[in-house]
Amino acid sequence: MAYPLQMGLQDATSPIMEELLHFHDHTLMIVFLISSLVLYIISLMLTTKLTHTSTMDAQEVETVWTILPAIILILIALPSLRILYMMDEINNPSLTVKTMGHQWYWSYEYTDYEDLNFDSYMIPTQELKPGELRLLEVDNRVVLPMEMTIRMLISSEDVLHSWAVPSLGLKTDAIPGRLNQTTLMAMRPGLYYGQCSEICGSNHSFMPIVLELVPLSHFEKWSTSML
């Protein structure tokens, strides 16, 4: 869950987001080491009186500053490619939900059910109940079973949108005429909030996303009540 003045990423709720957090820390450590080395060299050059250097033809130095950046890039690229392929891999999803972006709301269709679909609009500020979040609550939440692989098919009816839920590590563009897909799996129940992350018009800020992850038995009761 996000909180005011938050500096870091939200707590991970899915395996993919946990991998992304590890990769973020891994990359940040490399950037910190490089920055420290550069600052040290700059301070050394500013405080040392250089009277003679033989750097006009230093093959060893050129070899080092060619090979070392290549190694650093490989150390960053390999974990990144691994996570990228993990995010694209979808095998035998337990449930498929089709998401369509509109100006300015989302519509959802549970394709495994004959007639389970609804629109999801933001609740206006004046209609919020005590404890509800401004600009983040919706009239119809997306209820999904936890600890199950769920495929999200995402597209748009009008302009470019982007379906994003940070705590699950999800951000997929909704493009008119194109069907993108992503997968999600939540390891614990709860409410997970997101928003449209592509500027899509005057009410772009009023397209929240709310996922309610529940045990399978609760999801079955909910789906039965919706049919």
Swiss-Prot record:
This is Cytochrome c oxidase subunit 2. Belongs to the cytochrome c oxidase subunit 2 family. It is a multi-pass membrane protein. Component of the cytochrome c oxidase (complex IV, CIV), a multisubunit enzyme composed of 14 subunits. The complex is composed of a catalytic core of 3 subunits MT-CO1, MT-CO2 and MT-CO3, encoded in the mitochondrial DNA, and 11 supernumerary subunits COX4I, COX5A, COX5B, COX6A, COX6B, COX6C, COX7A, COX7B, COX7C, COX8 and NDUFA4, which are encoded in the nuclear genome. Residues 1-14, 88-227 are mitochondrial intermembrane. Cu cation A2 binds at residues 196, 198, 200, 204. PANTHER family: CYTOCHROME C OXIDASE SUBUNIT 2, CYTOCHROME C OXIDASE, SUBUNIT II. Component of the cytochrome c oxidase, the last enzyme in the mitochondrial electron transport chain which drives oxidative phosphorylation. The respiratory chain contains 3 multisubunit complexes succinate dehydrogenase (complex II, CII), ubiquinol-cytochrome c oxidoreductase (cytochrome b-c1 complex, complex III, CIII) and cytochrome c oxidase (complex IV, CIV), that cooperate to transfer electrons derived from NADH and succinate to molecular oxygen, creating an electrochemical gradient over the inner membrane that drives transmembrane transport and the ATP synthase. Mg(2+) binds at residue 198. NCBIfam families: CoxB (TIGR02866). One of its GO terms (molecular function) is copper ion binding. Its cofactor is Cu cation. Residues 46-59 are mitochondrial matrix. Binds a dinuclear copper A center per subunit. It catalyses: 4 Fe(II)-[cytochrome c] + O2 + 8 H(+)(in) = 4 Fe(III)-[cytochrome c] + 2 H2O + 4 H(+)(out). It is found in: Mitochondrion inner membrane. Cu cation A1 binds at residues 161, 196, 200, 207. Its EC number is 7.1.1.9. GO terms for cellular component: mitochondrial inner membrane; respiratory chain complex IV. It comes from Halichoerus grypus (Gray seal). One of its GO terms (biological process) is ATP synthesis coupled electron transport. InterPro entries: CcO_II, CcO_II-like_C, CcO_II_C, Copper_CuA, Cupredoxin, Cyt_c_oxidase_su2, Cyt_c_oxidase_su2_TM_dom, Cyt_c_oxidase_su2_TM_sf. The gene is MT-CO2. The chain crosses the membrane at residues 15-45, 60-87. The keyword Magnesium applies.
